[in-house]
Every structure is written in C-alpha cells, then in structure tokens.
From Swiss-Prot:
The gene is bglC. The active site is at residue 337. Its EC number is 3.2.1.21. It comes from Aspergillus flavus (strain ATCC 200026 / FGSC A1120 / IAM 13836 / NRRL 3357 / JCM 12722 / SRRC 167). Belongs to the glycosyl hydrolase 3 family. The lineage of its organism: Eukaryota, Fungi, Dikarya, Ascomycota, Pezizomycotina. One of its GO terms (cellular component) is extracellular region. It is an enzyme of class 3 (hydrolase). Residues 1-19 form the signal peptide. One of its GO terms (biological process) is cellulose catabolic process. Pathway: Glycan metabolism; cellulose degradation. Glycans are attached at residues 90, 112, 219, 270, 360, 476, 484, 524. This is Probable beta-glucosidase C. Keywords: Carbohydrate metabolism, Cellulose degradation, Glycoprotein, Glycosidase, Hydrolase, Polysaccharide degradation, Secreted, Signal.
C-alpha cells in the first residue's frame, strides 16, 4: 500500500519516508521533467524510500545492477578522456553510460570550487541521460589538511586547512572535532561531494606505520570519543539530504601491521597480534557503529597467527560477515579498499592487486570471494562484467547481488540525490574556503601544537629586540621577514635558530610508495651530527612535524625548546613561537626512546615501547598562558 509521505513526514525516519527539505537546484537549461504524474514510483518523492528502492530495483537489468557494485576514481576533465600509458583508464562517459557505474572517488586536486561544482553537475547530467537516470555519488579522500598523496589524501587547496586527524587528537577537544566535520561537510556538499572516505579510526600501535597522521593515535578511548563527534558532524544525528556519509576505516583496525610496513605493498601484507589484542582495535568500530556509521571499509592486510584465515580482510568471511555483521551488528555498506581484483598503477607505479593470501585466484574468483565474504562494493575497480558473468554462470545468485544493490540505492535516496542531484556553482565559490572556515582551521593548527620541552622557558619569544637575527631551516625566510626580523645564512651569525623538520623516515622508490613515510623513526648519524652543531652554536627552537612518533631523544636533550606539530603552516609556527598563540596539544602517542625499543614492542599493543622519552598525554604550557578562550595573547 502506498504511504502518503506528506502525512507521514513526522515519522519519516522510522518508516523509510523522506520528503525534500529544500528546493532542488536545477542548472540552467535543464528541467527535472521526469517528475510528473506518469513518472515511475522511484522518481516520485511522495513515495517512501523503501518503495522507491523496490520499484527501481525491479526495473534494473543485471548489467545495471552490476554497475552499482563498483566505486572507482574520477578525474576532473573531459568526460571522454581515457588517459594514456600507465594512466590509461575507462572514460567517465564509458563508465556511466556503458558500465552503468554511479559511484566515483574524485581523485584530482580542487583548485577552483566553482569549476569543480560545474564538473560534478556535468557528471550528474550525464547520469540522468541513462535509461534509469540513477544519480552519481561522488566521494573523496581527506582534503582539509597538509598531506598530498593520491592514494590517501590531498592538500586542502581551496578548502579550509586544518591539522591532520592526529593533530585534532592532540588537541583533545570534541567540540573542535565536531566543528571541523561540520565545516568539511559544508565545503564538500557545496561542490557536490556527498561521501567522505574517512574517518580512519585505526589505532597507531605500531609507531613505524606510514598512515598514522590520519589516525587519532594509539588510545582507543580517545579515538572512540572523537570519532563519534566526527561522524555526527558529517552525517548529523541521522543520515539525510543535508549529510555527507562517512566511510569508517580500516576494519578490523589497520594499525598492527607487521614491522610497521603498510599493506598497500606485498612486503607489508601481514597483520599480526603478538599481544593477542584484536579486541582493543575493535573498540573504535563499535563506537562508530553506535554513532550511526553507515559504511565501513576493511583494510588490505591479512591476519597471521590468529584464529582467522590468513587472507586479506575483504576476502575473509569470518571477518566481514561473522565478526562485523553478525557479532558487531553492522547493517550498512561494506566497501572494499582499492584494487583487490585487478593489477594497475598508482601515480605511475605498478601495483599488483592487493589480493593477499588469495593471489592464486583469478580475477573472477576474487570477485566471487569478496561477495561471499559479505562485501557490497568493490573499491578502485571498474569491472562490472565480472559480476554479470558470475550471475550468468550461476556462481553468484542475482538475489545476492540485489542485497548489496538495495543497500547502495537506498543510500542515494536517503542522501536526496534522486531528488536534488545538482549543486549551485556560484554558491560553491562563496562557501568553500570562506573567511570564517579558514579562521577556524588556522586556530586549530595553532592550538594543536604540543610543547615537548622548554629549557629556561625560552618560548615564547615575546621580549626580543627588533634587531634579533634568526637562522632558519624548513620554511621560507619571508615568514620571519614579515615580522621585521633578519634572517642570516649561518648559525654563527644568529641570535636564535628556528628549525622545522619532518619526522624522520626512510625514502622509498616509486611514484606512490615514495609518498609513504616508512622505516626508521630516527635521523641517521650524519644528520644528527649536522643538527648537533647548530644546537651547540645558538639557542635553537625545533618543530617536528609528527606524522609518525619520531625517535628524537638527542634533539630533546640538545635543543632549547622542541614542539610537535601535526599539520600547520609556517605562520602558525611563528605565532606559537612568538606568543601570539599558546600551544595546547598533548601527545596522542608515546615518543619512543630508541629504534631498539620500537623494534622490540608488540605491533598490536598500545604504549608498549620501553622507557619512552615522553608518554601519551605529555604537553607543556607557557609559563604565563593566555587567559582568553581562544588562547590568543594580546
């Protein structure tokens, strides 16, 4: 029986009904003419969502259903562009028109919000021209911080710029996390992005792992508290037309990778639990599910030395179906991480399919195994013909495909995409990177600084002469010169040295792999000796960008003051040094005392390095901290 959604609006969320809350934006020259008395049920917003899903699903061919199960990258540019060489790919027109795909990850830098909104509108126009007119869901990796790696995230560009997630954890302010998520949501929606391929709630129990900066550290309680605010900020109390859906990753926790090596790569495919501590890594996912997480992504890794089969998590039925769905009660969408079926290239680097533990399976067999495990959608793949073949051969039933397609379609209806797929490009230009959002991000950058040491209370440098000379490394002289101080060429000429260093890492080859900071957490002996000469020559203030917990006992001992930062520009650094802002951050992880201690610790156990230089929660305050709530000094 048809339910009148006008009458039922007060119980819409409970009944599956949802009426439009805003008038849809319609691009010039286009009319949503399908909405008339003869429109099918799925096109009629007065029907309830479940009825609309049922109607649409019944109209779909197996080819159209198969297209929904794939979620791959989308490059800004001509819709018929197929790339070339190692960057060859199916054109957007082909993926939407021929492969029936409607889920895409925008994998380009955004340099102009208006133009990006116009581009996504063109994508939606193309989708509406298909037989069923299913709108596109556009997703993105994180875009609001300082990391630039096509496989994991993008620099903020035109968006407001905030600390990495690890910096929000250092700040330990749930309000700031909620505000960040609300701001990011508004900026995403403005350009047409409706899915966030984050938060990353892995516990950073292995200090060498290359992906710590997007986590909230190694404490499960803090991570769980902050991720709730994050999800609520993006989605609201309930997913709806004003939401950006989140994808919580990487189940069942990607932190305890063997020897800290990342499972994007074959040498890092193993995940290990020498402390028998899987349950600790599940705690953030339990919190996410309780907070309304609608989508979860397993990681590439395969568990070793556990009760589970040593195959990658998305191929692992006991992980996805028995643990995630049955034991934890998750009823939403499971999206695999990228590239589990097909070999390919990332940033020009050859990357075999991350089918760890099932490398011997054919592409067809891999697809079948992933579906059998309980996953709904294949990330980073564009192979719907495999699903069609599996159904036609009888290997996978169409009913099984319908289960996943129903979840995916329902989400599009809940987000309001069938009724309002377009965005206003002019509004995007006003919303994205507006002054208020930018100011909030800059304040968070400054507040998240962690003061590790402050010998003789050298910072803040508030009472220094205008003739003071600075030796600097790691940032441009123009930042100091804007304060009307002089920059000199050597430590011997300087009154103070200001140094900004990335946390140590061992460079790796390859276009993609080179961007993953991995290996040793300590500076090599040559670099230590070079730095020591500076520390012995002039009072030195050091900032270490802690994308991983650096092993720097020698810097703590020799420098006058040491900060940890987690994504900030040089203006933020100088504001903290000169006392315009005060550091409020607390360490979101232990700082190890040596690489020997790192190598001896157990990958799955938090706070497990011997005699850390500083423990989780360490962070000094200035002797005379600013009194205002914004931590600004007059």
């Amino acid at each position: 029986m048809r339910i009148d959604c006008t009458v039922a609006s007060l119980t819409a969320l409970a009944s599956g009904c949802q009426a439009l809350s805003t008038r849809p934006y319609v691009p010039r020259g286009h009319s949503l003419s399908r909405r008339d008395d003869s429109a099918p049920i799925y096109r009629d917003a007065s029907y309830c969502i479940d009825e609309r899903v049922d109607d649409l699903l019944a109209r779909m061919t197996i080819e159209e259903k198969a297209g929904q199960l794939f979620h791959t990258r989308l490059m800004d540019g001509p819709l018929d562009d197929e790339g070339s060489g190692n960057n060859a790919h199916n054109s957007t027109s082909n993926m939407i028109g021929e492969k029936h795909m409607t889920h895409f990850n925008l994998a380009s830098d955004i340099t102009n919000a208006t133009e990006t909104a116009e581009f996504i509108n063109r994508i939606q126009e193309l989708a509406l021209q298909t037989r069923l007119g299913i709108p596109v869901t556009v997703s993105t990796d994180p875009r609001h911080s300082f990391t630039e790696n096509v496989g994991t995230g993008f620099k903020a560009g035109v968006f407001s710029q905030w600390p990495e997630s690890i910096g929000l954890a250092a700040l330990r302010d749930p309000y700031v996390v909620r505000k960040f998520a609300e701001v990011a949501k508004e900026e995403y929606i403005a350009v047409g992005i409706r899915a966030a391929l984050h938060p990353q709630v892995d516990l950073s129990t292995e200090p060498r792992w290359a992906r710590i900066s997007n986590t909230w550290g190694e404490n499960s309680t803090l991570t769980s508290e902050l991720l709730v605010e994050y999800i609520k900020g993006f989605q609201g109390d309930k997913l709806g037309p004003q939401s950006v859906k989140t994808v919580t990753k990487h189940f069942p926790g990607g932190g305890p990778v063997e020897n800290g090596e990342d499972s994007h790569f074959a040498y890092g495919k193993n995940q290990t639990y020498p402390g028998n501590n899987l349950e600790e890594h599940l705690k953030p996912f339990k919190a996410a599910i309780a907070a309304g997480a609608t989508e979860i992504m397993p990681y590439y890794s395969r568990p070793i030395g556990t009760e589970y089969e040593p195959v990658a998590f998305s191929f692992n039925k006991r992980i996805v179906t028995e643990l995630l769905r049955n034991e934890l009660g998750f009823e939403g969408i499971v999206l695999t991480d990228w590239g589990l079926i097909t070999d390919g290239y990332i940033a020009g680097q050859y990357m075999p399919a991350r089918a760890w533990g099932v490398e011997n399976l054919t592409e067809l067999e891999r697809a079948a195994r992933i579906l059998d495990a309980g996953c709904d959608q294949f990330g980073g793949e564009e192979r719907p013909e495999l699903i069609v073949q599996l159904v036609q051969e009888g290997t996978v039933s169409e009913d099984r495909i319908d289960v996943s397609v129903r979840r995916l379609l329902r989400e599009k209806f809940v987000l309001g995409l069938f009724d309002n797929p377009f965005v206003d490009p002019e509004s995007a230009g006003r919303v994205v990177g507006n002054d208020y959002f930018v100011r909030l991000g800059r304040e968070a950058q400054r507040r998240s600084y962690t003061l590790l040491s402050n010998n003789e209370d050298i910072v803040p440098l508030k009472k220094i002469e205008q003739s003071t000379k600075f030796y600097i490394e790691g940032f441009n002289a123009s930042f100091i010169e804007s304060w009307n101080y002089t920059v000199v060429d050597s430590p011997e000429e300087a009154d103070y040295a200001l140094l900004r260093y990335n946390a140590p890492y061992e460079p790796r080859p390859g276009g993609f792999e080179a961007n993953m900071h991995a290996g040793s957490l300590a500076f090599n002996d040559t670099e230590k000796a070079r730095q020591a000469k500076i520390y012995s020559t002039v009072p030195t203030i050091v900032d270490i960008v802690m994308d991983r917990p650096a092993v720097i006992p020698e810097i703590i001992e020799q420098a006058k003051a040491v900060f940890a930062s987690y994504g900030s520009d040089s203006n933020a650094f100088l504001d903290v040094v000169f006392g315009v802002s005060a550091p409020e951050g607390k360490l979101p992880f232990d700082l190890p005392s040596s690489m020997e201690a790192v190598e001896a610790q157990m990958e799955d156990v938090p706070f497990d390095t011997r005699n850390p230089v500083f423990k989780f929660g360490h962070g000094l305050s200035y002797a005379n901290p600013c009194a205002s709530s914004s931590s600004k000094c007059s």
